[in-house]
Amino acid sequence: MPRYKTVEQVLSLMKDITRVRNIGIIAHVDHGKTTTSDTLLAAAGIISQKVAGEALALDYLSVEQQRGITVKAANISLYHEIEGKGYVINLIDTPGHVDFSGRVTRSLRILDGSIVVVDAVEGIMTQTETVLRQSLEERVRPILFINKVDRLVKELKLSPQEIQKKLIDMIVEINNLIEMYAEPEYKDAWKIKPELGNVVFGSAKDKWGFSVPIAQKKGVKFSDVVNAYSSGDKSKVEELANRVPIHEALLETVIKFVPNPRDAQKYRIPKIWKGDLDSDIAKAMINADPNGPIVLMISDMKVDPHAGLVATGRVFSGTLRAGEEIWLVNAKRQQRVLQVSLYMGPTRELAEEIPAGNIAAALGLDQARSGETAVDIKYKDANVGSFESLHYVSEPVVTISVEPKNPKDLNKMIDALRKLSIEDPNLLVKINEETGEYLLSGMGFLHLEVSLQLLKENYGVDVVTSPPIVVYRESIRTKSQVFEGKSPNKHNKLYISVEPLNEQTIELIANGTIKEDMDSKEMARILKEQADWDYDEAKKIVAIDENINVFVNATSGVQHLREVMDTILQGFRLAMKEGPLAHEPIRGLKVVLHDAIIHEDPAHRGPAQLYPAVRNAIFAGFLTSKPTLLEPLQKLDIRVPMDFVGNVSGVITRKRGKILNMTQMGSIARITAEIPVSESFELASELRAASAGRAFWGTEFSRWAPVPDSLLLDVIMKIRERKGLPKELPKVEDFLA
């Protein structure tokens, strides 16, 4: 099976969409995702003629070992033949760590199928479940690979019958998850059925693997596996790898069970496209039409030291060529594609064009970020929709300040931070204008540790960091009366009340169902049906800011209000960025403008007059409505031997946590709990100590919750002191002068 291909050969395969498969490998940490993709790359990665000369003597992987790096391509293309027909299989990199938001990882959006890797000994873990759920929500078809089967023989010393029982139990567990999370029409069709061949058993490290049909065809039994490992003879294991090579088993299963892009887009576009399904663009995507308008979903932005920013994404419709003018829907920018390339193995090779259904790499889209939708420029003003609105549910909750160890490295550090924040949209980089500090905010302690490690490893920048600071939000618990906000010149008056948004409204905005720019009648209908709003009031929502605060214009017939509305809304957004308690962002506030008196002369009603008027009225209302701070909570998922449950529960309660659920599986307990992020900094070492190092756990952002009243004042004072604010809390009168 020659893998040495010219770009033309690969392109001609890509043009026949029935010969393309887009897949990803998803797994819990350490279950063998990297080993699996490395094994596939070594055995089936397409090698271009240029690389072939060098690569004949050296496998890709040994090239990597010589350079001492792991080639982390956003995509790797593989080649496999079945019955004389060649196929291109795009293996798309999915991030190894759970995207803490539980929000669907962007890379799943461009897959049609996933290989779910499970460790034969550890079984289905939290993350396996999270990622499987996410892929089913995106209508990505799973196939199963039970890896490390050798551990069942070497460590657990099981007999062939016991091995089969253990594997069947695992398949049942995966099928239960599919039954739970898949939509009705896929529940049965996508179940794992060994006799059909959509599950592979094997060892990626030892390079062997088979499905039931392959085992029958080649006459391999589980007793052969047991014998190969029990004998202690390495050549027996190698012989197994020659008889049933893992890459053949996996790629054959992928070609057979994962749909081609055209078949997949028919049922996936209605689920993942957030625009009108009757539009030309949606129809072209549903048919994966290479002659339709260009639609590209960008799933990955990487910084290439030689080429600059490389956008990798899937062409859902049209054909991408260099020189095309395209429109970035979320960034609202026009950009020009300077160069188009395709992936061969892990390397990028220049191409004239990439047709619909395939994965492309493009240069020139430096304003794009992962999650962006790029469309043909002629749809610039058509409000076509996109694959994803730009906010992530998991807002950054922990901040540290960073400075370079060596002051000479300041510019290098700034550049590295900018590149990191492009590659990871959940990482926020800010400069504190007053102190000149560089602040780095992330989804949790672990997330920041990983980012600092990348700074050092990828960019060679050593930094000194401050102790972590937890990010809070300010909010209120009751409704205020109407307050008058005056402008400094006393010529403009705004009459405003505030009240807390209910949980349903917050959820609808957080998950992107309600967006600022949607049709007001549609918004009002959803809010009335799902969040108890009054329809007429909901129609008057004129702004929603990034921290989930809403501005309602309930006035009627106020002179000159139209001309200054934009300024008032700008004032509202600014006020929401720093609340009165501790200058932390405000969250979950409904601001209602009831009436206004606006000066007729534009010179007397500019931002300098209206910003303070808006802010004063909002803050006066805020301080009378039982103000509070919200703190971020983390969800913990812990697996620990039963003997240590008491100790572990003790750690959780000591940290103001609460246990939500506890189940027992054999001798292992699975504990789900919530703890405040502010209490989580020493968590890892304490859990290890409490369980003699035998607890496994994962964390993800859970929700915002009010700080307990007994701690509230203390927390506010500490934040004020850190920010250099006066000790006295502001009073209502301060805003009514």
Swiss-Prot record:
Catalyzes the GTP-dependent ribosomal translocation step during translation elongation. During this step, the ribosome changes from the pre-translocational (PRE) to the post-translocational (POST) state as the newly formed A-site-bound peptidyl-tRNA and P-site-bound deacylated tRNA move to the P and E sites, respectively. Catalyzes the coordinated movement of the two tRNA molecules, the mRNA and conformational changes in the ribosome. InterPro entries: EFG_II, EFG_III/V, EFG_V-like, EFTu-like_2, G_TR_CS, P-loop_NTPase, Ribosomal_Su5_D2-typ_SF, Ribsml_uS5_D2-typ_fold_subgr. GO terms for molecular function: GTP binding; GTPase activity; translation elongation factor activity. It comes from Sulfurisphaera tokodaii (strain DSM 16993 / JCM 10545 / NBRC 100140 / 7). This is Elongation factor 2. The keyword Protein transport does not apply. Coiled coil: none annotated. HAMAP family: EF_G_EF_2_A. Residues 18-262 form the tr-type G domain. Its main location: cytoplasm.
